[in-house]
From Swiss-Prot:
Gene coding for it: mutL
Listed name of the protein: DNA mismatch repair protein MutL
Described purpose of this protein according to its UniProt entry: This protein is involved in the repair of mismatches in DNA. It is required for dam-dependent methyl-directed DNA mismatch repair. May act as a 'molecular matchmaker', a protein that promotes the formation of a stable complex between two or more DNA-binding proteins in an ATP-dependent manner without itself being part of a final effector complex.
Family of the protein in this entry: Belongs to the DNA mismatch repair MutL/HexB family.
Organism taxonomic ancestry: Bacteria, Bacillati, Bacillota, Bacilli, Lactobacillales
GO BP annotation list: mismatch repair
Length: 647
């Protein structure tokens, strides 16, 4: 008796549903994408109990002919592709012919549809993938699909559904992404009769952003645009002052399809450089138009993973588009808005009975204000990246040394905020180190210093109004740019080690490093296999001080394993960040007028005077208009959606 049998179609569909239909939001995604492919301009999504009880999608698309309705429930039945060649020219959102039969196999499904030119429409009812009835019906052109009792015959899947609020949040996210991908379609989302999302369908992406994220957010979005022979990149990104705590507000679209791509996310962060605070993420909608031949969407049934040819070229295009648009903006945050966002509810009002004034000293005391960036002060921090002197070498040689030395990973720096970074946690490093080297010179307002508060903040005025400067962040930026230039120079010479070092790795890392060893050789690190999962280092590059060999080699290897790249500049930039932070003036340090003015002059000469190396703002701005609003001299005007075109 044969052991291998062909599974019944309903069972096969239920198995496929395990990948295609993960939760109610998956049903919404697949059915709305079908509606978009049908040419709909209005789509209404109605759900009950976060989609577990009922999901209904109504559109005004081309509908289905009577003969096609039953066929749509057959596996791999589709109108999107006809032959193998079409698989490489996919411009529709759906093409596999799996979604509708998979959904039907785990729910009670009703389809009401009519095609243009048909006398009657069709109503089809199916339960568990089996068609129970199909009748003619009078209905307008378009399609209405109702999915009820989702997962009724797969209790294991139903058991592990999250809370109703969590499932609803996934549905809202799906509809929001599709609304941003297709601003020409008017979307309406209702849950238990309550409207959650509505977009106008005008085709204006900024209007769609306003409908989803709000008018205030839309006003702080910057348009980007760039193209080459293969790609067209457009969309909007938020100003650096408008960020979120996670990546969920980044939407990347390829030919109208929302995708997830780590490298393209990285290109967005690279475009911002050091303008983002560590741990903060921008709001972005990046629309990429690409020849279908360069994108393989047939990777996963959910079609959210796409393989892209010429991915590095696309990353460079996105990065330059964002960087160019931000260079054209005034990046000094509006202080009045920051105050409104950071105000504390229920804060007690302080009563001030007097306004004591302190006369500012008009002299310069170098002993009090050791903060000027000079070659001498830099030399104190940056030790020559050269070999030891002959005397030190001879003294080491006279001591008894083992034939090899076991390298150890260095302990974490005691300064948790500004200590050494872990290359295995690269999210901070990518934004805080690699991007710092790509900054370009920015225009900076001409400021006139006039005071200091609490030994921490400097006050200056300019044509733009009142400016408040964080003196520590300002000097940190000044010193960082100076240090970066000094330690960015790399000497590729090698020096023999008197005692070689052994570096031990896990089995998988050891194999990966053997394959990627040519990349380490490019930065003059030559590791040789030496026993089980161990490498030996017999010589080190001049740019690497001997006391940092162990930590530097391990960090460079960690960088290579995680990013497939290795960069001396990135590693040395970390040192520049640490030195600039530790050598900068701290809070509660009074500056005399000469020192404060000179700090502002040096800040104005920086390539990026707006943020410290960690991404914190250096200064904020109160405009004359802001001051007049605070003192009720003028009333704030409220902007409507129709005014968005002015920004």
């Amino acid at each position: 008796m044969p052991k291998i049998i062909e599974l019944p179609e309903v069972l096969a569909n239920q198995i496929a549903a395990g990948e295609v239909v993960e939760r109610p939001a998956s049903v919404v995604k697949e059915l709305v994408e079908n509606a978009i492919d049908a040419g709909s301009t209005q789509i209404t999504i109605e759900v009950e109990e976060s989609g577990l009880s009922k999901i209904q999608i109504t559109d005004n698309g081309e509908g289905m002919a009577q003969a096609d309705v039953a066929m749509s429930l057959r596996r791999h039945a589709t109108s999107k592709i006809k032959n193998q060649g079409d698989l490489f020219r996919i411009r529709t959102l759906g093409f596999r012919g799996e979604a509708l039969p998979s959904i039907a196999s785990i729910s009670h499904l009703t389809i009401v549809t009519a095609a243009d030119g048909e006398v009657y429409g069709t109503k089809l009812v199916a339960k568990g993938g089996e068609i129970e009835s199909q009748d003619p019906i009078s209905t307008p052109v378009g399609t209405k699909i109702t999915v009820e009792n989702l997962f009724y015959n797969t209790p294991a899947r139903l058991k592990y559904m999250k809370s109703l609020q969590a499932e609803l949040a996934h549905i809202v996210d799906v509809v929001n992404r599709l609304s941003l991908a297709h601003p020409e379609v008017a979307f309406t989302l209702l849950n238990d009769g309550r409207q959650l999302t509505q977009t106008s369908g005008t085709g204006d992406l900024r209007q769609a952003i306003a409908g989803i994220y709000g008018l205030t957010t839309a006003k702080k979005m910057v348009e980007i645009s760039n193209s080459d022979l293969d790609f067209e990149v457009s969309g909007y990104v938020s100003l650096p002052e408008l960020t979120r705590a996670n990546r969920n507000y980044i939407t990347i679209l390829i030919n109208g399809r929302y995708i997830k791509n780590f490298l393209l996310n990285r290109a967005i962060f690279d475009g911002y450089g050091s303008k983002l605070m560590v741990g903060r993420f921008p709001i972005a909608v990046i629309d990429i138009q690409i020849d279908p031949y360069l994108a393989d969407v047939n990777v996963h049934p959910t079609k959210q993973e796409v393989r892209i040819s010429k991915e590095k070229e696309l990353m460079a295009l996105i990065k330059s588009a964002i960087a160019q648009s931000l260079r054209e903006q005034d990046l000094i945050p509006d202080a009045l808005e920051n105050l409104a966002k950071s105000s504390t509810r229920g804060a007690t009002r302080s009563v001030q009975t007097s306004l004591p004034l302190k006369q500012t000293n008009l002299y310069y005391d170098s002993s009090r204000n050791d903060f000027f960036v000079t070659p001498e002060t830099v030399q104190e921090d940056i030790k020559p990246l050269v070999s030891k002197s002959e005397s030190s070498v001879s003294s080491v040689a006279n001591k008894q040394q083992p034939t090899v030395k076991q390298a150890k990973r260095s302990a974490d720096d005691s300064d948790s905020e500004h200590g050494k970074l872990d290359y295995k946690n690269k999210s901070k490093l990518k934004r805080m180190l690699e991007n710092l080297t790509n900054e370009e010179t920015s225009t900076f307002p001409e400021l006139e210093f006039f005071g200091q508060m609490h030994g921490t903040y400097l006050f200056a005025q300019g044509q733009g109004g009142l400016y408040i400067i964080d003196q520590h962040a300002a000097q940190e930026r000044v010193k960082y740019e100076y240090y970066r230039e000094k330690i960015g120079v790399v000497d590729s010479s090698l020096q023999q080690l008197l005692v070689p070092y052994l570096f031990e790795f896990s089995g998988s890392d050891y194999i990966s490093l053997q394959e990627k060893m040519p990349l380490l050789n490019q930065v003059c690190i030559y590791l040789e296999p030496y026993g089980n999962n161990t490498f030996i280092l017999r010589e080190h590059p001049i740019w690497m001080k001997e006391e940092e060999i162990e930590s530097a080699v391990y960090e460079m290897c960690d960088m290579l394993l995680l990013t497939n790249e290795v960069s001396v500049k990135t590693y040395r930039a970390e040192l520049a960040i640490m030195m600039s932070c530790k050598r900068s003036i701290k809070a509660n340090h009074a500056l005399d007028d000469y020192s404060a003015r000179d700090l502002l002059v040096q800040l104005a000469q920086c390539k990026n005077p707006y943020n410290c190396p960690h991404g914190r703002p250096v200064l904020v701005n109160f405009t004359k208009s802001d001051m007049e609003k605070m003192f009720r001299r003028i009333q704030e005007n409220h902007t409507s959606l129709r005014d968005l075109g002015k920004y």
